[in-house]
Swiss-Prot record:
The keyword Transferase does not apply. It comes from Halobacterium salinarum (strain ATCC 700922 / JCM 11081 / NRC-1) (Halobacterium halobium). GO terms for cellular component: cytoplasm. Belongs to the Sph1/Sph2 family. The lineage of its organism: Archaea, Methanobacteriati, Methanobacteriota, Stenosarchaea group, Halobacteria. This is Smc-like protein Sph2. The gene is sph2. Pfam families: AAA_23. Residues 153-295, 355-517 form a coiled coil. May play a role in replication. The keyword Secreted does not apply. Gene3D superfamilies: P-loop containing nucleotide triphosphate hydrolases.
Length: 667
């Protein structure tokens, strides 16, 4: 038999997981007051473990107890016992569950292997009541079984968080790119300033050379030079302070404009937390109502289908004809025939049962209509909820920004007051210097004084150029930093987008993986078991409503469906599609087990629980049970199977551990 690629991948993964455990180690299970068991202590080895025994020997009770300590549904307690216990020693760790019967219910306490009850009940404990097996036997919803462990709510919340983060990063990138647009003009300005500064330095150098040629009094020349230098320095300082004051005033005015705009926007916002709470409360009620309606519709549909089968099956043992069954009227009109009701035992005409079924069908239609209305209202409320949340978030942002603006305006006012005082001081010192220079009018009129004044002006001009050039260089350095930040943000944005795509397709990917796993394993199983006339059993993914995070899940109410197909083959080798109902009980049980195996692998259950429990395989013949167990053993490090003696004898191999089942207490 050629192994499918998907099956090979899963075998490799399970093999890697098995290597992480002590594969020579044993699993010890102790159970007390579980089902028909008073007390038992069993040890299992890695590989296949067979619980060999007849019915009523406690095999199923032990498996149910083991499922409970693994993390599954609590088992049934023995008789009238009020307390029970299951203990599991595995891989160096002891797990336990204590069960107490209280007020008609069983309460559990202790440390199970996992808190994921759904994984254990769906894909680990494959007893007669396993949902995957029942879904095939009862023609149930396969997708619901396989996809039940997926937390769509968590996926939705993660998508919303990623969208918010992506939008925030996008806004920051756009702001940075607006700033980067200034690079060309700043670079050009830097080139101009460097050129102007070189020219200014050259003029200063030439003027100083000219001053050295004058034969003026050195002390007097030095005194006037110092005075003029101080005068120009004070002018430069005064201009710098004036520029700073102008900048602070412009910034304060811009803040006040922004403050006014935000206050106007906040006044225009109309929102109500009470309305949001009302919507959330209503959403909770409607969601609960939708689940309740879905359950009711499923239950009523099952009742209608069951009773339709009974009414249409004249040979049903549950419908026993009354004394008037052989009357001429009954033969002419079978619907008037009286039968014994299979629920209460009274005599009733068939047409009354048919009428009751019509009433139930009408009720199912009413419930479906009501569910559709509820789903529509849920969608509308979720849209309103999102709009309100966005408005409230914007209002909070405005309030926070207004608070920041108020603080900034107060800070600007304080800075302006300090700068005004500083400007007055500089004015005073400047007046004193101007008075000193004016007293030396005669010297100022000389050529020497004019040249010193020109030198002072050039040095002042040079200082202005250096200051502006330094500012331009700082702005260019900031643009370099912003460019690096933009590149990092774009990389982060790409990662977020990739995760968004992954989250949005996660449901579909899981569905397709589950279907591929089922189809591949089913193909291999059919090749191994060789059922007559069955060429193929496969699942087709039927598109339904797509998962939409902005509307809280699947729009329209119906998700994707898994449709099971059966292809048979005539004696001449011609294939044709048959119905699922045509499958024998044995074939249905095998299909159900493969559905559970697909879920076990797709959801990586073996990473948490490297164990699988099989029971109620009597519908399958012994040779096929042996082949099935051998196949499943490749995917479960510990496979525990409850079998009748004649079925257990068909299993061979040194790796199979047989445990005689005699756990049930004698009454």
């Amino acid at each position: 038999m050629e192994t499918n690629a998907v099956s090979l991948i899963y075998r490799c993964r399970v093999g890697e997981r098995m290597s992480q455990h002590d594969t020579d180690g044993r699993v010890s299970v102790y159970a007390e007051n579980i089902g028909g068991i008073s007390q038992c202590d069993v040890t299992f080895k890695p590989g296949v473990n067979v619980l060999r025994g007849r019915n009523a020997t406690g095999r199923t009770s032990l498996l149910n107890g083991l499922a409970g300590v693994l993390g599954g549904t609590a088992p049934v307690l023995k008789g009238d016992e009020q307390e029970a216990e299951v203990r599991l020693e595995f891989n160096g760790t002891t797990y336990d569950q204590q069960y107490t019967r209280k007020n008609g219910t069983v309460q559990a306490a202790g440390q199970p292997v996992t808190e994921r009850r759904d994984l254990v009940d769906l894909f680990v404990c494959l007893t007669a009541e396993n949902p995957a097996r029942r879904a095939i036997v009862q023609d149930g919803n396969l997708r619901d079984v396989i996809m039940r462990p997926v937390d769509t709510g968590s996926i939705q919340r993660r998508i919303e968080d990623l969208q918010s983060e992506r939008n925030r990063i996008g806004q920051r990138i756009r702001a940075i790119e607006d700033d980067l647009d200034q690079r060309t003009s700043l670079t050009s300005r830097k080139t101009t300033l460097v050129s102007d500064l070189d020219e200014c330095d050259q003029e200063i150098e030439e003027l100083r050379n000219q001053l050295e040629q004058f034969d003026a009094d050195p002390e007097e020349a030095e005194e006037i030079e110092q005075a003029l230098t101080s005068l120009e320095e004070r002018k430069q300082e005064l201009e710098s302070i004036t520029n700073r004051i102008r900048t602070q005033e412009d910034t304060r005015e811009a803040l006040r404009d922004e403050q006014s705009e935000l206050q106007t926007e906040r006044e225009a916002i109309e929102t109500s937390e009470e309305e949001l709470k009302r919507i959330e409360t209503r959403l909770s009620e409607l969601t609960s109502r939708e689940r309740s309606l879905a359950t009711t519709i499923n239950d009523l549909s099952a009742i209608v289908d069951f009773n339709e089968d009974l009414v249409s099956n004249a040979d049903s043992d549950l419908l026993r004809s009354g004394d008037a069954a052989e009357s001429p009227v009954s033969k002419l009109n079978p619907m008037s025939e009286t039968v014994e009701c299979w629920t209460c035992g009274t005599e009733v005409e068939r047409n009354r049962i048919a009428g009751r079924l019509d009433d139930l069908r009408d009720l199912v239609d009413e419930k479906r209509t009501e569910r559709s209305e509820v789903q529509t209202e849920i969608e509308e409320l979720r849209e309103s909820q999102q709009e309100l949340q966005e408005v409230i978030h914007r209002r909070d942002e405005i309030g926070q920004r207004l608070s920041e603006i108020s603080s900034e305006i107060a800070q600007r006012d304080q800075t302006l007051e300090s700068l005004s005082e500083e400007r007055e001081d500089v004015h005073q010192r400047l007046s004193e210097l101007e008075e000193f220079v004016s007293e030396r009018e005669a010297l100022q009129e000389s050529e020497l004084t004019e040249q010193y004044q020109q030198l002072s002006e050039l040095e002042y001009q040079r200082g202005q150029l250096e200051e502006e050039l330094s500012a331009v260089r700082e702005e260019l350095a900031e643009l370099d930093r912003l460019e690096n930040e933009r590149d990092q943000l774009q990389a982060q944005q790409d990662e977020i987008q990739a995760e968004l795509v992954s989250q949005r397709t996660q449901i579909r990917d899981l569905e397709e993986s589950a279907i591929t796993a089922f189809n591949d394993h089913m193909e291999e199983i059919l090749d191994v078991l060789r059922y007559k006339n069955i060429a193929r059993v496969w699942i087709e993914r039927k598109e339904g409503a797509e998962f939409n995070s902005s509307h809280g899940g699947y729009r329209g109410g119906s998700a994707t469906k898994f449709e099971l197909h059966v292809v048979r083959e005539t004696d001449e080798g011609r294939g044709y599609e048959d119905t699922v109902q045509s499958l024998s009980e044995s074939e249905r049980e095998v299909v159900g087990l493969v559905v559970a195996l697909a879920g076990y692998l797709v959801h990586d259950v073996y990473e948490v629980i490297p164990m699988m429990l099989l029971d109620s395989l009597e519908a399958i013949d012994a040779d096929r049970i042996a082949a099935l167990v051998d196949y499943f053993a490749d995917y479960a490090p510990y496979l525990i199977v409850a079998l009748l003696p004649e079925d257990a004898d068909a299993l061979g191999g040194d790796e199979t551990s047989v445990v005689p089942a005699s756990f049930a207490s004698e009454e």
